[in-house]
Regions:
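Alpha-helix C-capping/helix-to-loop hinge sites
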Residues: 37, 55-59, 77
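Alpha-helix N-cap and coil->helix boundary residues
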Residues: 43-47, 62, 66, 84
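Short, positively charged loop/turn segments that connect secondary-structure elements
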Residues: 53-69
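Short, cationic-aromatic polyanion-contact patches
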Residues: 85-94
Length: 94
């Protein structure tokens, strides 16, 4: 009997022409780590990715790819705000 495929989540980013389909468990793990990492205030992407990697040291996949993909979805959902020049991320409402 074939192994069932893991659940997928469609993610979108502002100005993306197509959605990306990612493993739901990975999305939830990365999204949770992003939200926990942004609790301290606005940070650059490199620092955000490093914090996520520290929170998920055994993550199976590219932490930086999943971080940018998930942070853009959280931005569309209104949970995260991306500031321009220099680009910084922070929680919505801060």
């Amino acid at each position: 009997m074939p192994t069932p495929r893991p659940a997928r989540t469609l993610v979108r980013g502002k100005q993306w022409t197509a959605r990306k389909s990612v493993d739901t468990a990975k999305f939830e793990a990365i999204a949770g780590a992003i939200l926990a990492s942004l609790d301290a205030g606005p940070i650059a992407f490199g620092e955000l990715s490093a914090r996520v990697e520290r929170l998920l040291p055994r993550f199976d996949g590219s932490v930086s790819w999943y971080t940018i993909t998930c942070v853009r979805e959280l931005e569309v959902r209104g949970q995260v705000v991306r500031q321009e020049k220099p680009v910084r991320y922070h929680l919505s409402g801060r």
